[in-house]
Amino acid sequence: MSKRDYYEVLGVGRDASEREIKKAYKRLAMKFHPDRNPGDKAAEASFKEVKEAYEILTDANKKAAYDQFGHAGVDPNRGGGGGYGGAGDFGDIFGDVFGDIFGGGRRGGGQRQAARGSDLRYNLELSLEEAVKGLTKELRIPTLASCDVCDGSGAKKGTSATTCTTCHGQGQVQMRQGFFTVQQPCPTCHGRGKIIKDPCAKCHGDGRVEKTKTLSVKIPAGVDTGDRIRLAGEGEAGEFGAPAGDLYVQVSVREHAIFVRDGNNLYCEVPISFSKAALGGEIEVPTLDGKVSLKIPAETQTGRMFRLRGKGVKSVRSHAVGDLLCKVVMETPVNLNERQKELLREFEATLTGESKKHSPKAEGFFDGVKKFFQDLNS
């Protein structure tokens, strides 16, 4: 009997995407799966047909051969084509799509792979100076390391683990529950796939031991709160020789007494005297590289921002350097003696009648207030 067209089997068009093909396969495989149709030979045949169509149409090379030559292009008994090897066992492809729903994973597959080591996270707090300039930090990391007595095998020196005879190295066993077959960790080997008859005395068969290791970690200049540094292979050791996990260093930067950071720019407030603001002059302002001089123009108002280019932070991701922005805040003099108070009174008296000239903002404000109340009463 001639085979049906694979696209027809799945109920999709020839221009169907891989996602549409997979969706159709899921629906039909669920419908015809033998675990849902026990003893139904027709359903079993339909499942094999659906599975075969899915295998061909989701393999780029086989699909191309099928689209060009039809079934002949994927017939292993013919000279050309993609060498398709038949429908095989139910579980091979079904497990890829449904996982453990029916316990149909790779029944004919290899032994369970040892698990990769867990990733670790280390929270590192830096001062602003450390974050901006970069440094090398010595970190002490509590972790699980490969046992140095058994070299991570978990078995006593001179012995080795044997394949579990219950699960045959799979690490899982199948249990039937009604119409369904589910997979559970093997109760004999506890999901490992191997049995250690003579465990290592140091690690007690685990292959790993608790250890605190010291790492020298280079922190690049310009890091900021939220940045993360990945150290490949510095996490926990894997099970029985499997690859180690990674270590992630999570950076946070403490608040600074003077500077506030925003991206690559730094901000600070610089107090200046009343006379300096009025007459102008030079003041010293702090930077992360030391003090620098800043020229204050005469008649500078409080809150004015001055930009010192290139005095900010060098970006950790580029060569760009931010700026330092200094906000001047005029400080009202306190603890005045009588002579100083008298001088200020004399100065205030000289401003009488000339407020618009000397304090235009204040005069404008009070004019606005006066007009506001006049409008209320009108």
From Swiss-Prot:
- The UniProt entry lists the main location of this chain as cytoplasm
Residues in CR-type zinc fingers: 134-212
- Residues reported in the UniProt entry to bind Zn(2+) 2: C164, C167, C186, C189
Give the cofactor binding note.
Answer: Binds 2 Zn(2+) ions per monomer.
Q: Which Gene3D superfamilies match?
A: DnaJ domain (1.10.287.110), Heat shock protein DnaJ, cysteine-rich domain (2.10.230.10), Urease metallochaperone UreE, N-terminal domain (2.60.260.20)
One GO cellular component term of this record is: cytoplasm
Q: Where's the J domain?
A: 5-70
Q: Give compartment(s).
A: Cytoplasm
Pfam families in the record: DnaJ, DnaJ_C, DnaJ_CXXCXGXG
Under the GO molecular function aspect, what terms does this record hold?
Answer: ATP binding; heat shock protein binding; unfolded protein binding; zinc ion binding
Q: Supply the NCBIfam families for this chain.
A: DnaJ_bact, PRK10767.1
What's this chain's function? Answer: Participates actively in the response to hyperosmotic and heat shock by preventing the aggregation of stress-denatured proteins and by disaggregating proteins, also in an autonomous, DnaK-independent fashion. Unfolded proteins bind initially to DnaJ; upon interaction with the DnaJ-bound protein, DnaK hydrolyzes its bound ATP, resulting in the formation of a stable complex. GrpE releases ADP from DnaK; ATP binding to DnaK triggers the release of the substrate protein, thus completing the reaction cycle.
Q: Which family does it belong to?
A: Belongs to the DnaJ family.
Q: Please identify the protein, giving its name as recorded.
A: Chaperone protein DnaJ
Give the organism the record lists.
Shewanella oneidensis (strain ATCC 700550 / JCM 31522 / CIP 106686 / LMG 19005 / NCIMB 14063 / MR-1)
What is the phylogenetic placement of the source species in the record?
Bacteria, Pseudomonadati, Pseudomonadota, Gammaproteobacteria, Alteromonadales
Q: Which gene encodes it?
A: dnaJ
